[in-house]
């Protein structure tokens, strides 16, 4: 069986059944079985679809006629058939056309099908009677019409075909603005319109397109209007494509440039002739099209990417081909394209759209484009004059973005930029200087360009308004008269300090940073920028007059923000100039380095971040590896600047921080310079000690020096410890002592091998020799061999010089000398600082106590200097505990803790006589045995007291002093333990304190933690009295401890009472659960060493 026979066999029965039910439709009077007809149409459609599913072959025309025969009555009398049946019938026609009639190109059949389908779509029962058609039937009908129209090639000179074309076009256009139309129906009708107007198989004559142009524009515009029905993105895109192609074909500049006047137009001989194309027709049509285009351009605010692409293509072809015809809307077309290009969500359009637009502008005549851009800029100026004052920020930003888009293409025609120069001041006035709310990360400020770095800062809030304005200012760099613009900005910037001058300063810097190509004397403007920036950097004193209280005033706060922004703009300019000059900028470091360090030390994080970024950029641009290397290479500049400030009594709040920064990054190499500065400070303090603010600033410098030197010493210890640990952890390398021992072996190969144990015992003659290790004996032997060798060389006159040892000795001597210089400088500073411990100003006394605390770390390296210093400042420090200022007391306790921890047993008598009575009084006055609030002054004093007592017990104290310290410490610990909200470091501090006391007397600590802390003071519990109960020393913290009341007995008294109770209530067989009093009283007695063996005595 052939393929066609197989299809026929499958569809024969369904279509035979359909013929039976559809034949009555041929007569108007015969009755129709609606259900049977509907079911037969359904079976026929599904049978045909099933038969044609797995085949690509076309149906023969005779088979198509056989199938179509029972469907024709349904199409003609569709109003007598249920809508579902009509739907199945039209779908059968669609299948027949796709698989058979499409290749036949039967003109008459195509026209008949079009007419029948249009009647069904429009609901025509007769030329005089219509009904509302079912929406589902209309959708299927227009989808079928789309396929049928593809084969329709009308002859417009044939009236019948002309009218059929007009009816099909009008029916499709009527559906687009209809509110009852679905998306599917709109899409199908738009596809029909597209195939009718823009066919691929033939060219629609322009004169006939002109006839239908008003209806096409009207129908599509109504659908695309803001309140139109065409909202689905696919429908919008196809509507824009149809409208663009239609307008370009009808009124393009090439098609309308030689139109005749009205009187010269020839009349048409056809009775249905096309519209006459004359100049008056062009004016009327272009006006209608301009209004339509303006109504459609609201789509540029759409967020759909497909709509944005379609609208850009629509505007582009109209701007390219109808620039002269659509003069009324070409400004709107250009602005719409620029707005679409600048949308962030469509980067693809931004890339290819700008390239197309720039290429188009370059291809046009300059005169024409200058005229267009001039119109655009004049229109923007008119709008901006009404918006800039009263409109919201969003509206202003929208207009500025519009201007930015226009200026982006105006750069290709620089003459048009002259129109915007008068409006530059108004544009800059929208910026408000802001120095707060901006990220203060210095690394984010830096911008790399090849091998150089410079700052790219934000000064007006870092918002979109600032970025847009910056791009607008940058576009003026290619203006012909940019020279005059820069002169105007520079004169405004150097005038009185106000918002306008700061904005002009910023705009002047932005213009210079951009590629200014039309200025001949560019170096002159760069020098002017550098000079003014340097003047601004030297005016930091204007910012130091503001205090925290003064910033509460709104006007003063605005002035402060203004000065901060101006300083940051100057710093930005200096970094950019250093990137231009590179290594040549090194010669200017003498002038710029110290002002930048002052700004680095300024209290505002905004200003200090700019200064830090600038120093980093200068270090990179001048070929320094790090800012620390930059400082070490130019340390003399900084110290000389500090000395100059001191000589003129110009002590700013930034001087101490600058000195701290210098010491931190110089690795101790600045000592030889700072010594002169310290001497100058001493002289000023002696002469002007009555000036509190000057004194505070100078003492702050000394405090910064001491603090940083102490921190540097601690960091060096840590670094050395880490290096040794790393060396010990390296399994592939021996430790330092073994390597030294191996080196000695290589230098002394003749050293005898060690003896065995018996031989060594015979060779021991005294106790001293017995105690020497083999390594020490070997070292002594090596030294003797070296001395012996040296004597032999002297006798022979052949003495040699060990250059390596000499160099190492010289370096050691230099290191020792530098260390002595540091200690001597710190000693002088501490001697001067202790004179101000009695100053009437609390802040100065607090700073001096901190200075002594840090200075003790340095002085402790030389006990011969440290102990006499303690004798001098100790009485002045201890007396601070009697004051009523909690901050002063806390700092005094911190200093005492530092001194006691470093001086060891040197402080024993002072602890007993001077410190202990004051600590007891301090606890009562400040109620330190009570539970305090977290972070309160009492809480801080409790923590400081624990540090002091833990440092005191490390000295050789008597048992009485020890128990008194325990009586102070234990209640404070219980108070801290029972706080509702604990400080993060409280637990570790408590454990450290218990461990410090436990090293001297673990029994006392056990009693305080286990007995008093468990509420067993009144009567012993049976658990403690059980025979065999052993005491276990605990080195960890208990979780259940009870606060001791303020009036409770001291630890010593209660402990002795409990010992008495124990002795009276125990039997001889019971073991003692508590420590004996003998252990406590013999706390400090040294243990007797083991007896030496007899052989050592011999």
Swiss-Prot record:
Region (Disordered): 768-795
Cellular component terms per the entry's GO annotation: cytoplasm; cytosol; TTT Hsp90 cochaperone complex
Cellular localization per UniProt: Cytoplasm
Key word Signal present: no
Keywords noted in UniProt: Cytoplasm
Disulphide bridges: none
A matching Pfam family: TPR_TTI1_C
Keyword check for DNA-binding: no
Family matches, as InterPro entries: ARM-type_fold, TELO2-interacting_protein_1, Tti1, TTI1_rpt
Entry similarity comment: Belongs to the tti1 family.
Function, as annotated: Component of the TORC1 and TORC2 complexes required for the regulation of the cellular respons to changes in available nutrients.
Subunit and partners: Component of the TORC1 complex composed of at least mip1, orb5, tel2, toc1, toc89, tor2, tti1 and wat1. Component of the TORC2 complex composed of at least bit61, orb5, sin1, ste20, tel2, tor1, tti1 and wat1. Interacts with tel2.
PANTHER family: TEL2 INTERACTING PROTEIN 1 TTI1 FAMILY MEMBER, TELO2-INTERACTING PROTEIN 1 HOMOLOG
Name of this chain's protein: TEL2-interacting protein 1
Gene that this sequence comes from: tti1
């Amino acid at each position: 069986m052939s393929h066609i026979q197989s299809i026929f066999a499958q569809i024969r029965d369904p279509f035979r059944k359909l013929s039976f039910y559809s034949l009555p439709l041929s007569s108007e009077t015969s009755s129709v079985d609606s259900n049977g007809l509907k079911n037969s149409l359904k079976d026929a459609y599904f049978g045909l679809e099933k038969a044609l599913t797995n085949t690509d072959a076309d149906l023969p025309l005779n088979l198509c006629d056989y199938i179509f025969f029972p469907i024709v009555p349904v199409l003609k009398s569709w109003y007598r058939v249920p809508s579902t049946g009509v739907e199945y019938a039209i779908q059968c026609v669609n299948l027949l056309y796709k698989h058979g009639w499409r290749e036949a190109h039967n003109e008459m059949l195509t026209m008949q099908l079009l007419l029948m389908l249009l009647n069904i779509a429009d609901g025509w029962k007769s030329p005089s009677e219509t009904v509302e058609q079912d929406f589902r039937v209309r959708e299927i009908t227009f989808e079928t019409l789309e396929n049928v129209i593809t084969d329709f090639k009308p002859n417009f000179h044939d009236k019948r075909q002309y009218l059929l074309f007009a009816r099909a076009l009008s029916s499709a256009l009527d559906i687009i603005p209809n509110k009852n139309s679905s998306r599917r129906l709109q899409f199908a009708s738009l596809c029909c319109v597209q195939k009718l107007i823009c066919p691929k198989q033939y060219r629609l004559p322009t004169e006939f397109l002109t006839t239908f142009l008003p209806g096409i524009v009207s129908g599509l515009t109504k659908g695309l209007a803001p309140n139109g029905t065409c909202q689905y993105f696919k429908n919008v895109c196809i509507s824009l494509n149809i409208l663009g192609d239609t307008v370009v074909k009808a009124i393009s500049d090439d098609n309308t440039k030689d139109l005749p006047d009205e009187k010269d137009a020839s009349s048409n001989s056809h009775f249905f002739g096309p519209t006459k194309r004359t100049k008056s027709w062009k004016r009327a049509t272009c006006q209608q099209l301009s209004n339509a285009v303006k109504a459609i351009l609201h789509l540029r605010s759409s967020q759909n990417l497909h709509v944005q692409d379609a609208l850009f293509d629509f505007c582009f072809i109209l701007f390219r081909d109808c620039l002269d015809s659509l003069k009324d809307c070409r400004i709107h077309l250009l602005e719409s394209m620029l707005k679409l290009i600048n949308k962030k969500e469509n980067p693809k359009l931004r890339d290819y759209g700008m390239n197309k637009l720039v290429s188009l502008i370059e291809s046009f005549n300059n005169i024409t484009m200058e005229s267009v851009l001039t119109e655009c800029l004049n229109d923007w100026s008119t709008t901006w004059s009404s918006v800039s004052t009263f409109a919201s920020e969003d509206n202003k930003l929208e207009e500025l973005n519009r201007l930015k888009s226009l200026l982006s293409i105006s750069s290709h025609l620089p003459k048009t930029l002259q129109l915007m120069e008068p409006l530059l001041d108004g544009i800059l006035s929208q910026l408000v200087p802001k120095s707060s709310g901006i990220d203060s990360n210095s690394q984010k400020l830096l911008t790399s360009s090849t091998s150089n770095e410079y700052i790219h800062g934000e000064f007006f809030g870092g918002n979109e308004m600032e970025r847009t304005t910056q791009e607008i200012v940058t576009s003026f760099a290619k203006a012909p008269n940019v020279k005059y613009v820069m002169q105007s900005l520079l004169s405004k910037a150097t005038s009185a300090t106000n918002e306008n001058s700061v904005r002009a300063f910023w705009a002047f810097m932005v213009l210079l940073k951009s590629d200014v190509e039309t200025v001949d004397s560019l170096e002159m403007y760069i020098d002017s920028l550098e000079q003014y920036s340097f003047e601004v950097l030297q005016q930091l004193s204007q910012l130091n007059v503001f205090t925290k209280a003064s910033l509460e005033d709104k006007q003063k706060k605005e002035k402060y923000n203004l000065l901060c922004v101006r300083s940051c703009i100057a710093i930005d300019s200096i970094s950019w100039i250093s990137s231009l000059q590179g290594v040549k900028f090194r010669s200017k470091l003498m002038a710029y380095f110290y002002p930048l360090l002052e700004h680095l030390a300024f209290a505002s994080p905004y200003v200090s971040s700019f200064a830090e970024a600038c120093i980093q950029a200068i270090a990179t641009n001048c070929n320094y590896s790090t800012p620390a290397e930059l400082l070490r290479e130019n340390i003399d500049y900084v110290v000389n600047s500090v000395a100059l400030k001191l000589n003129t009594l110009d002590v700013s709040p930034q001087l101490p921080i600058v000195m701290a920064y210098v010491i931190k990054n110089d690795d101790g190499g600045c000592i030889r310079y700072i010594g002169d500065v310290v001497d100058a400070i001493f002289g000023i303090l002696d002469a002007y000690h009555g000036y509190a603010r000057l004194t505070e600033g100078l003492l702050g410098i000394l405090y910064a020096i001491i603090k940083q030197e102490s921190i540097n010493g601690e960091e060096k210890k840590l670094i050395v410890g880490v290096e040794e640990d790393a060396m010990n952890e390296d399994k592939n390398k021996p430790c330092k002592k073994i390597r030294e021992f191996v080196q000695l072996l290589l230098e002394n190969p003749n050293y005898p091998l060690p003896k065995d144990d018996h031989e060594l015992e015979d060779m021991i003659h005294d106790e001293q020799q017995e105690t020497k290790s083999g390594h020490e004996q070997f070292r002594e032997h090596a030294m003797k061999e070296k001395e012996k060798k040296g004597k032999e060389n002297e006798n022979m006159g052949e003495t040699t010089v060990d250059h390596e040892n000499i160099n190492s000795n010289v370096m050691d001597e230099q290191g020792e000398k530098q260390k002595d210089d540091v200690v001597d400088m710190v000693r002088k500073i501490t001697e001067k600082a202790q004179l101000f411990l009695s100053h009437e100003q609390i802040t100065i006394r607090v700073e001096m106590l901190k200075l002594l605390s840090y200075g003790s770390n340095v002085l402790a390296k030389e006990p011969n200097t440290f102990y006499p210093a303690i004798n001098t400042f100790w009485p002045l420090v201890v007396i601070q505990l009697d004051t009523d200022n909690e901050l002063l007391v806390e700092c005094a306790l911190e200093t005492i803790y530092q001194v006691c921890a470093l001086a060891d047993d040197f402080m024993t008598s002072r602890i007993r006589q001077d410190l202990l009575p004051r600590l007891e009084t301090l606890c009562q006055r400040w109620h330190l045995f009570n539970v305090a609030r977290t972070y309160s002054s009492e809480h801080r004093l409790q923590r400081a007291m624990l540090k002091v007592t833990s440092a005191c017990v490390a000295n050789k104290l008597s048992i009485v002093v020890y128990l008194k310290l325990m009586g102070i410490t234990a209640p404070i610990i219980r108070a801290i333990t029972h706080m509702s909200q604990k400080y993060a470091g409280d637990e570790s501090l408590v454990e450290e304190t218990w461990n410090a006391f436990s090293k001297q007397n673990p029994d006392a600590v056990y009693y305080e933690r286990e007995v008093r802390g468990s509420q067993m003071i009144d009567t012993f519990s049976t658990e403690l009295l059980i025979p065999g109960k052993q005491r276990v020393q605990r080195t960890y913290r208990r979780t259940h401890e009870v606060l001791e009341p303020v009036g409770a007995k001291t630890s010593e008294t209660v402990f002795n009472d409990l010992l008495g109770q124990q002795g009276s209530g125990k039997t001889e067989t019971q073991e003692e659960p508590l420590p004996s009093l003998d252990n406590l009283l013999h706390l400090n007695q040294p243990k007797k060493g083991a007896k030496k063996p007899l052989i050592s005595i011999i």
